[in-house]
């Protein structure tokens, strides 16, 4: 009987750990960093994208000002980008931009938008913009310059 109980507990523990792993893997989504189709910038490195989104780089080659588009705070895509690209949470990100603004290093903060449709609309309206979308929201109106994670 004790062997049966041990095996039952072991099987239940394995089942629980498998469901936990499935829940974690569901959290891993591919986020694509995108620019308008008309923007001819080549593929970008993670570091280049990080510098652009952190307002450390503010213009494309040729001098055109970069407009950074972010999902609004609380959105899943934003949390993934903050975690995977910046290694920050929302509080750290906010603190970074408050400090940058107070020291004069910040030329223009990213524009927070509520949805993928709004990001795509802004990208369509501004050839110098950069943003991100969940892979499933990417269509032929944008060009992917980096895939996360």
Where do the protein language model's features map onto the residues?
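Bacterial N-terminal signal peptides that target proteins for export
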Residues: 1-9
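Intrinsically disordered, low-complexity and often Lys/Arg-enriched segments
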Residues: 2, 21-22
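Bacterial N-terminal signal peptides
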Residues: 8-19
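Flexible loop/hinge segments at secondary-structure junctions
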Residues: 24-149
């Amino acid at each position: 009987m004790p062997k049966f109980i041990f095996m039952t507990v072991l099987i239940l523990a394995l089942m629980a750990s498998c469901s936990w792993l499935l829940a974690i893997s569901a959290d891993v989504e591919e986020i694509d960093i995108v620019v308008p189709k008309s923007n001819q910038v080549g593929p970008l490195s993670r570091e280049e994208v990080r510098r652009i989104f952190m307002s450390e780089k503010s213009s494309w080659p040729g001098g055109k000002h970069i407009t950074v588009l972010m999902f609004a705070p609380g959105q899943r895509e934003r949390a993934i980008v903050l975690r995977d690209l910046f290694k920050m949470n929302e509080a750290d990100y906010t603190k970074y931009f408050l400090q940058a603004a107070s020291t004069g290093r910040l030329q223009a903060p990213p524009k927070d938008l509520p949805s993928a449709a709004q990001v795509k609309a802004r990208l369509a309206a501004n050839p110098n913009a950069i943003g991100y979308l969940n892979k499933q929201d990417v269509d032929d109106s944008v060009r992917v310059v980096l895939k996360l994670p």
